[in-house]
Swiss-Prot record:
It comes from Pseudomonas putida (Arthrobacter siderocapsulatus). It is a multi-pass membrane protein. Induction: By iron limitation in addition to the presence of one of the two cognate pseudobactins BN7 or BN8. Keywords: Cell outer membrane, Ion transport, Iron, Iron transport, Membrane, Receptor, Signal, TonB box, Transmembrane, Transmembrane beta strand, Transport. It comes from the Bacteria. Belongs to the TonB-dependent receptor family. This is Ferric-pyoverdine BN7/BN8 receptor. GO terms for molecular function: siderophore uptake transmembrane transporter activity; signaling receptor activity. Specific receptor for the siderophores ferric pyoverdines (pseudobactins) BN8 and BN7, iron chelating molecules that allow the organism to extract iron from the environment, especially under iron-restricted conditions. Residues 278-809 form the TBDR beta-barrel domain. Its main location: membrane.
Length: 809
């Protein structure tokens, strides 16, 4: 019985055993399960649905009156309480508690809920509970959650410095892929989301073979976070399902202040969905060409009458083929989270996620772009060099728990523990050789990988305001402890003997059906990676004047990595690397020109150890990458925060950039420089009109001022917009966008790909207040292009359509 048949027969058993087991154990430990979300607490909890608000900045009293009328609540307070106080306004879709928190931010007042939809206002003994600038817990700060706002931007983010800042206050380039944007474009995984993100280049070295890489400002992205907690690249973040996340925050430039080491490219922060105070649920379904089908549900709300326990459960299932022959994928997500209000000041959160993906015949490293005679191949996009016995199976599991405490006087603290593991088993096949015009010349080169890397993190910090020289400032300090362990079997490496055998030959690629003898792999040894990182950081935002702010921070890191390779019957090879007392400074400054525009500048150090596999001719690890990063820019906030704009210029200087030479050998490039410009606009242009547009120019050069990394575009432009029609057509939303990039190529003189643009469209119809139907048409003009180009290339996704529905209740 082949691997495919075993997987199909075992799928149901796996779901009933492993997935159900994870759900039962995970939710049991939380004291909740999906059915509990249907408890009568929904009916008994005093709840108000979310509403749209558009309250301008100004005096507080009329703003509160406007809010009370829009939210249909009774808000009582002494008149003297609001005298002389003002608000920054409120724009977007929020529930009552969220709206009041944002409206009252910085006023020193707080609202408390009474009976029969009544609220009272009083002076806050601990203003930090409501002040936007003083809260930075779990992405829960008022204005940070994007679900339900309908916007293509957010009101606040803490991904850059962990201080809760508005996009305008953040002294680095920031893009937030909001829940509305993810839904409108049907961006279902991280690769989809980043392909739509300005300033990010996605290089696909295959399809379904864990070979996607993400690049920003000329360098590969290596910093990933989930809810602000760093996670290893070996946990295959690229395959994360967007169904469990509220948004994706991308900070371009080095963020070593809070995220691992100081990688110069970008940091990707995935923010999980949280339980909602009000009951809500939705069911989705989708169908598209290439036999792509999916369904999911998302249920959230209070689990008790008082609402002091809240839960959320998300499930998503997809089965899909693709435009290449024999490819087939099944994936399943289960995510649960519960919040417990242990007191008015203490919040306990526990949760889990489980993602399984089984892929048949994944394409690895693409197909030749030139024949042996030198002409371009122009192969059919449906060709696949993967045999029917190849596969790529993953099971990703994560458990997390945290406790958050309001400490008084605007201070709060958080401790979070996470455990994540990624069980994988991969049997890939590479097409090797020179392709002849008659389809002959290629051989198969199979390889197998398997293992279960694990990572444990402890993250703790405290944040709050302090007074100095008569002004109030903000501070955050914390520690991160990370332990990564990977012990994997060795399967004998690349099967060159198989490539040279009759069973390994591909007689004619043009009509090959993927049939060949499956190679036998015998475990031949063990390898391991043990990596520990301990870091402490301190950051403060000083309010120098009403218009001038200064952010100063530093991070102190101890890092150690031990790797070993133990072949059975051979000599063990060990490589040990350690860095202690690494100091990473950070500085940022912002100056408000007026109520709309701000100038900013930032500086940070770059320090990043090389990957465990990056060694020189002597099998010695390369020295860590080191350098500095500079960024200058101007940012604007428009329409009461519904629209954000930015212009940035940057320069990165780096030594010891790893350049591949041959096999597993790298050299260290010195004096590399990356510089460029980024422009971006995100948010609401007018009522019902959302837009995102971004242009990026980036070029990386060596010590001789020669361009390197030419497989990355020098120029790129990405845009997407959606518009809800008015009048009798107000149930219809239409949208579309274009992704364009300039010429690229591994060698621009012998092989290159010219500039190209991919156009995408969408439409949604609200059948009634509960049910909506959508259609997405991608690559409308069926543009043929390589998503990775060189001697081997991988075609980008051809024209495709996806229809979907969503029922909310």
């Amino acid at each position: 019985m082949n691997h495919t048949a075993r997987k199909r027969q075992g799928w149901q058993r796996s779901v009933s055993q492993k997935l159900a087991g994870a759900v039962v154990q995970g939710i049991a430990c939380m004291g909740a399960s999906a059915p509990l979300l249907l408890m009568p607490a929904w009916a008994t909890a005093a709840a108000q649905a979310q509403a749209d608000f558009d309250i301008p900045a100004g005096p507080l009293a009329p703003a509160l009156a406007h809010f009370g009328q829009s939210a249909h609540i009774l808000l009582s307070y002494p008149t003297a309480l609001t005298e002389g106080r003002s608000t920054s306004g409120l724009a977007g879709r929020f529930d009552i508690d969220q709206g009041l928190a944002i409206l009252l931010a910085g006023t020193g007042l707080e609202a408390s809920r009474g009976a029969n939809a009544s609220y009272s206002l009083q002076a806050s003994a601990s203003t930090g509970a409501l002040e936007l600038s003083a809260v930075s817990i779990s992405g829960k700060a008022p204005g940070s959650t994007t679900e339900g706002t309908g916007l293509y931007t957010t009101y606040s983010s803490s991904s850059s410095t962990r201080l809760n800042l508005t996009p305008r206050e953040t002294p680095q380039s920031l893009t937030v892929m909001t829940r509305q944007r993810l839904d409108d474009q049907r961006l279902t995984n991280l690769t989809d989301a980043l392909e739509a993100t300005p300033g990010i280049t996605v290089v696909r070295d295959g399809l379904g073979s864990e070979s996607d890489s993400y690049w920003s400002r000329g360098f590969a992205i290596q910093n990933y976070e989930v809810d602000g907690v760093p996670t290893s690249t070996r946990l295959d973040n690229y395959s994360q399902s967007m169904a469990m996340f509220d948004r994706v925050e991308i900070v371009r430039g080095a963020t070593g202040l809070i995220s691992g080491m100081g990688n110069p490219s970008a940091t990707i922060n995935l923010i999980r969905k949280r339980p909602t105070a009000e009951a809500q649920a939705s069911i989705t379904g989708e169908a598209g060409n290439w036999d792509r089908y999916g369904t999911g549900f998302d249920v959230s709300g209070p689990l008790t009458e008082t609402g002091n326990i809240r839960g959320r459960f998300v499930a998503d299932y997809k089965t899909e083929k693709a435009w290449i022959d024999r490819y087939n994928q099944q994936s399943q997500l289960m995510y649960g989270i519960t919040e417990f209000d242990l007191s008015e000041d203490t919040l306990l959160t526990v949760g889990f996620s489980y993602l399984r993906s089984d892929i048949d015949s994944p394409l690895r490293s693409g197909l030749p772009t030139r024949f042996s005679t030198g002409e371009r191949t122009n192969l059919k996009r449906s060709l696949n060099a993967a045999p029917d016995w190849s596969y790529n199976d993953h099971e990703q599991t994560s458990f997390f728990t945290s406790i958050e405490q309001q400490l008084g006087n605007g201070w709060s603290g958080k401790i979070e523990l996470t455990h994540a593991e990624n069980k994988f088993d991969e049997l890939f096949n590479f097409a090797m050789g020179e392709l002849n015009p008659d389809g002959s010349g290629l051989s198969q080169l199979p390889v197998r990988f398997s293992g279960t890397p694990r990572q444990d993190n402890l993250d703790l910090y405290a944040t709050g305001p302090f007074s100095l020289f008569g002004r109030e400032h903000e501070l955050i300090t914390g520690m991160t402890l990370s332990q990564y362990r990977e012990n994997t079997p060795s399967w004998g490496g690349w099967r060159y003997d198989y490539a040279g055998s009759p069973a390994g030959a591909i007689d004619n690629l043009f009509n090959w059906d993927g049939k060949s003898a499956k190679p036998a792999f015998v475990e031949s040894g063990k390898s391991s990676i043990d990596e520990d990182q301990y870091a402490a950081y301190l950051t403060s935002r000083f309010s120098v004047t009403d218009d001038l702010s200064l952010i100063l921070g530093s991070r102190l890191i101890n890092w150690k990595r031990d790797t070993s390779d133990r072949p059975y019957g051979g000599e063990e090879t060990e490589v040990n690397r350690e860095e202690n007392g690494v100091f990473i400074p950070y500085a940022g400054v912002g100056y408000d020109l007026d109520d709309t525009w701000s100038l900013y500048a930032s500086y940070t150090k770059i320090f990043n150890p090389q990957g465990a596999w990056v060694t020189d001719e002597s099998n010695k690890p390369l020295d860590p990458m080191e350098g500095v990063g500079y960024e200058l820019g101007i940012k604007g906030t428009h329409l009461n925060g519904k629209l954000n704009s930015s212009l940035a210029v940057f320069k990165l200087e780096q030594d010891n950039l790893a350049i591949w030479q041959h096999d597993n050998v790298y050299s260290a490039e010195q004096d590399t420089t990356s510089k460029g410009i980024e422009l971006e606009l995100n948010g609401e242009l007018a009522e019902g009109w959302q837009a995102s547009a971004g242009y990026s120019y980036s070029v990386t050069t060596d010590a001789d001022d020669q361009r390197i990394n030419t497989n990355l575009p020098r120029n790129s432009f990405k845009t997407f917009t959606s518009y809800r029609l008015h009048g009798p057509l107000d149930k219809i939303t239409i949208g579309g966008g274009v992704n364009w990039q300039s010429k690229v190529g591994a060698d621009l003189h012998t092989f290159s790909q010219g500039s190209y643009a991919v156009t995408n469209l969408m439409a949604r119809y609200d059948i009634n207040q509960h049910l909506s139907a959508s259609v997405n048409l991608n690559n409308v003009f069926d543009r043929e292009y390589y998503s990775q180009s060189g001697l081997y290339g991988v075609y980008g996704t051809p024209r495709n359509v996806m229809t979907s529905f969503k029922y909310s209740f």
